[in-house]
């Protein structure tokens, strides 16, 4: 990310500088470097204003997610996933801590709980390495878990919905159908590709490989509180849930416009009702979750400032227009507008960088959150994860 950030800034600087050298002054018109300077200051200010605008929406969604988490929704999802995971990872014992960590990681990602998913993912890789006969070389299970994690099975892209709401989208939750379709497709492709590659290039273990388990570092321990997740539901329950999720795609496509206005109110009523049924003190828990939303919105300010300033430098220097003109005909032929290309390139590399680019694109008056490009970049952010 350091190299990418520097390349973006230097490209904008030298592109604007080149135009400045050959600039023909126009009375009352700014020079290229003046335009660049103004864009930098305005984008830095705009990044802070955007983060402040996100506070309320992030507080709402993280408050609701906290109620769902306290009520045990994470455990329910983990129990649904477990029978499928046991079959996808035959090399990992069903009762091994690695299996539990992977299940909890995927369940947290489904709910958009990135902060909870990250430590589970790290713990999963640590535990998988203990089963690794050749440390330093990824096993088939490690590769498959990384592929599934990167494809990001997501049911509720709360962060993207919050950003779209802050950008003034007419229907912030309208990306749920496209996100669901994309995440199912990407996960299916990830599993098939990983399994095929395992067959085409089987893992070989050196005879002299160290087969000792990696030592456990007590400082890296991640609390695994969901003991109930160790007992999964029957396989038919998991398959029924998977079928229902796939069936939501055509329903969302054909009836999405009618259903989407109900999504956010239904989420609030549903999660609060779920919390009441599970005897959660919904008000207190909601407030605690909302505090997390405030902290998240404030914490992303430095990332937004860095990325929005860099992207606006590209735009103000004229480099972005040149890139759009050069690549628009190529990428546009398969449905990827050149304006969305920076997002497609950044998403696998940096979550915070992609979030900043998404904010820049959907807050651009020429694009907006309700355009095709706005929907596309929102779906890219909501349905994939960094590698």
Q: Which sequence ranges carry the predicted segments?
A:
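Hydrophobic alpha-helical transmembrane segments
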Residues: 6, 102, 146, 176-177, ...
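Membrane-core helix-loop-helix motifs of multi-pass transport proteins
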Residues: 128-236, 368-387
